[in-house]
Amino acid sequence: MSYNITSSNQYQYFAAMWAEPQAMLNQCVSALSQSYQTQAARDTVRQQFSNLLSAIVTPNQRFPESGYRVYINSAVLKPLYEALMKSFDTRNRIIETEEESRPSASEVANATQRVDDATVAIRSQIQLLLNELSNGHGLMNRAEFEVLLPWTTAPAT
């Protein structure tokens, strides 16, 4: 028994692109209340989102029988998730100084504005992702999955 792979683009469904819906929703809600003033804080939350993803099917392991799973690579969620991951990475762009040990007042003000901009971007992307998840976009159950990738059983002997 296995999935009937008929096209090379079907291999994407075996990648670590799946998450439990409740865990993803909870992470979004929790992340909206976080502070993003340091790169370490941004890295921590980015890692928390990344840790939610796993592979749930293989060519020989069937999609879970009950419940829904979030497919982060869906047409609706993929651009939102990618934008969220990019918004966390502000390393080396926050403080750009002439003399690193003594930033000028304008460099500090510029860095503060960049941190604020990064925080706004992160919160905005999280809210967009949360909205789409709440609307049911990117969620799949076994029946929906197996329309895309049929499960075949061995012929009776």
From Swiss-Prot:
Keywords for the protein's UniProt record, in alphabetical order: Acetylation, Capsid protein, Helical capsid protein, Virion
InterPro entries attached to this UniProt entry: TMV-like_coat (IPR001337), TMV-like_coat_sf (IPR036417)
Pfam families, sorted: TMV_coat (PF00721)
Gene3D superfamilies: Tobacco mosaic virus-like, coat protein
Modified residues (N-acetylserine): S2
UniProt GO molecular function: structural molecule activity
GO cellular component terms given for this protein: helical viral capsid
Function statement: Capsid protein self-assembles to form rod-shaped virions about 18 nm in diameter with a central canal enclosing the viral genomic RNA.
Protein name, entry field: Capsid protein
Source organism of this protein record: Ribgrass mosaic virus (strain CAB)
The encoding gene: CP
